[in-house]
Amino acid sequence: MSDINTARLPFFQPPEFRPPCVGDDIEMVLTRGE
């Protein structure tokens, strides 16, 4: 669980500043983690 939280930290920024593939990947990880 802590690994997921750590992975989320770098992505705490507006979606327009991160590649769509990264956003999809992090959403998949969060959905799988929860």
Swiss-Prot record:
Processed by the macrocyclase-peptidase enzyme POPB to yield a toxic cyclic decapeptide. POPB first removes 10 residues from the N-terminus. Conformational trapping of the remaining peptide forces the enzyme to release this intermediate rather than proceed to macrocyclization. The enzyme rebinds the remaining peptide in a different conformation and catalyzes macrocyclization of the N-terminal 10 residues. GO terms for molecular function: toxin activity. The keyword Oxidoreductase does not apply. Transmembrane segments: none annotated. Keywords: Toxin. The keyword Ligase does not apply. InterPro entries: Amanitin/phalloidin (IPR027582). It comes from the Eukaryota. There is a cross-link at residues 11-20 (Cyclopeptide (Phe-Pro)). Residues 1-10, 21-34 form a propeptide. Disulfide bonds: none annotated. Belongs to the MSDIN fungal toxin family. Probable toxin that belongs to the MSDIN-like toxin family responsible for a large number of food poisoning cases and deaths. This is MSDIN-like toxin proprotein 3. It comes from Amanita bisporigera (Destroying angel). The gene is MSD3.
